[in-house]
Design a protein with these regions (language model features):
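Sec/Tat signal peptide C-region and signal peptidase I cleavage site
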Residues: 23-27
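A cross-kingdom marker for long, charged
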Residues: 28-343
Length: 343
């Protein structure tokens, strides 16, 4: 081997090692940041609040105590934002923010603001509102040992498992009502991309592909929603191996609306996994194939692969299904981080 080739090889190896180190450092930095935010939040609580917010990591009752419904209809455990001081609330939201990407936390805030809009629309109905969200921690916040952060209320259930440098967001439920509202003179659609990207993918299919993707029956709600842990369903619709490269890229971009909610380090790992699975991933559609410009679709759709199930389900409760949406994000092999924490 020539001196030049040796230098090139060594340089490439050094660069690879540096890149690898930076990748690990970013992941560790993310975990360190989340643990620090968790400890800061806990330090703001009094003894009773700490007792209410902390659970054993193996507490299955608490782990699965999440719902789409308002907290007055399905009781949550933990500490409610409404019961916190301004400093405690700020620390709680800083903790949630630390575990999410910037766009992910923005989506969470917009879902909560949507519930505030619903509260006002319903005559200040006390079962709605952006302060009716609970936070809880399962296990001890740690950079090494697994633990879990939960945050949720009406139309939101984040289940975030932290295991060393790995982070898992499944199962997570996002929803919104109204799906379109105005704030500070701007139109807000918290789950608008989830609708628009799916419709764009459907419209990118040719006639043969559309016939495969569109189901012959109607689905009106989530199949794998709250209370359906461990349930399995057969893939339906159009398999991505029958798509062209552009269509598969559009499917991955759609999936990223959920995968990228978690912080960037974990999202990168997750998207790499899902990209490797893409040819074994299915896209199914049920319902109308058009939407009013600027509004969300009124059709159900599902994305399903070896390590992911995503559902989008408009709701007829409240009238216009384009204005009331439920979505579900699962990993049938790793909900609650079970693959990472199995002994």
């Amino acid at each position: 081997m020539s001196v030049l080739s040796m230098r090139t090889t060594r340089g490439g190896l050094a660069l690879a090692l540096i890149c690898s180190s930076l990748t690990i450092a970013r992941a560790q930095t993310a975990t360190t940041r989340i643990v620090s935010a968790a400890n800061t939040f806990l330090s703001t609580l009094d003894q009773k609040q700490r007792q209410n917010v902390l659970f054993a990591f193996d507490d299955e009752k608490q782990r699965t105590r999440w719902s789409n419904l308002p907290t007055s209809l399905v009781l949550r455990a933990g500490v409610n934002l409404k019961e916190m001081s301004a400093a405690q609330r700020s620390a709680a939201l800083a903790l949630v923010s630390s575990a999410l990407s910037r766009r992910g936390f923005e989506k969470v805030e917009q879902i909560m603001e949507g519930d505030e809009v619903l509260k006002i629309k319903e005559g200040n109905n006390s079962i709605f509102g952006k302060d009716l969200y609970y936070i809880s921690i399962l296990g001890k916040p740690s950079e090494k040992d697994p633990w879990m952060l939960q945050f949720g209320g009406h139309h939101l259930a984040l289940n975030i498992t932290i295991a060393g440098e790995r982070g898992v967001l499944t199962p997570t439920l996002t929803g919104v009502q109204p799906a379109l509202y105005s704030m500070d003179g701007k139109t807000v659609r918290p789950l608008g991309q989830e609708s628009d990207k799916a419709l764009a993918l459907l419209n990118a299919l040719d006639d043969t592909q559309r016939k495969q993707a569109i189901l012959s029956y109607r689905l009106a709600d989530l199949v794998l929603g709250p209370g359906q842990d461990g349930k399995t369903i057969e893939p339906e619709g159009l398999k991505a191996s029958a798509m062209n490269e552009r269509q598969r890229a559009m499917l991955l971009d759609l999936i990223s609306e959920w995968a990228d909610i978690i912080h960037e380090s974990a999202a990168t790992v997750r998207m790499t996994e899902l990209k490797a699975d893409i040819n074994e991933t299915w896209f199914a559609w049920s319902g109308p194939t058009t939407a009013t410009p600027g509004n969300s679709i009124t059709a159900y759709y599902r994305v399903q692969g070896p390590h992911v199930v995503i559902e989008y389900a408009p709701q007829r409760l409240g009238g216009d299904p384009s204005m009331h949406v439920h979505t579900m994000y699962r990993d049938p092999t790793n909900d609650y981080g079970r693959r990472l924490t199995a002994k």
